[in-house]
Amino acid sequence: MALDQSFVGRTYPPTPAYEVGREKIREFAEAVGDTHPAYVDAEAARALGHADVIAPPTFVFSITYRAAGEVVRDPQLGLDYSRVVHGDQKFSYVRPVRAGDRLTVTSTIEAVKSLAGNDIVDIRGDVHDETGELVVTALTKLVARAAEEA
């Protein structure tokens, strides 16, 4: 089923705030094998001009992908989640994510198209801190694979 083109430009409500903790940053850095000292040591982060530890660049994926899930679960869009794979991901940072940040994500559908029977949706996730400052924009491409022929 083709996706509804009228959804391009639709913006979803912001997510509840996610509080970024030092331990979550440490766990994430360890999980992805990133040993940069600024991710685990506040003194190392301060030496680089940050008030506290900062998160690896891909840390926000977990909260932006969860926010993109709101788009995917919208029954009116018509995306078959059972066939969805992650196609691409890009981040554009204004500043690093820091321990203590309280972040919300607002998702907007940037593009909807069909290609070779696959449905493709591009979602922009704008991540703001509690003051409303834009921290990072995540661009996520999701692909709902074409149904297999019997």
From Swiss-Prot:
Which Pfam family, any one of them, does this sequence belong to?
Answer: FAS1_DH_region
The cross-references to InterPro entries, in alphabetical order and at most eight, read: FAS1-like_DH_region (IPR039569), HadA-like (IPR016709), HotDog_dom_sf (IPR029069), UPF0336/Enoyl-CoA_hydratase (IPR050965)
Q: Which GO terms describe its molecular function?
A: (3R)-hydroxyacyl-[acyl-carrier-protein] dehydratase activity
- Where does the UniProt annotation place the signal sequence? none
Q: Cite the CDD domains for this sequence.
A: R_hydratase_like (cd03441)
**MaoC-like domain segment(s):** 10-116
GO BP annotations, alphabetical order: fatty acid biosynthetic process
Q: What protein family does this chain belong to?
A: Belongs to the UPF0336 family.
HAMAP family found in the cross-reference section: UPF0336
UniProt protein name: UPF0336 protein SGR_2883
Question: Lineage of this protein's species?
Answer: Bacteria, Bacillati, Actinomycetota, Actinomycetes, Kitasatosporales
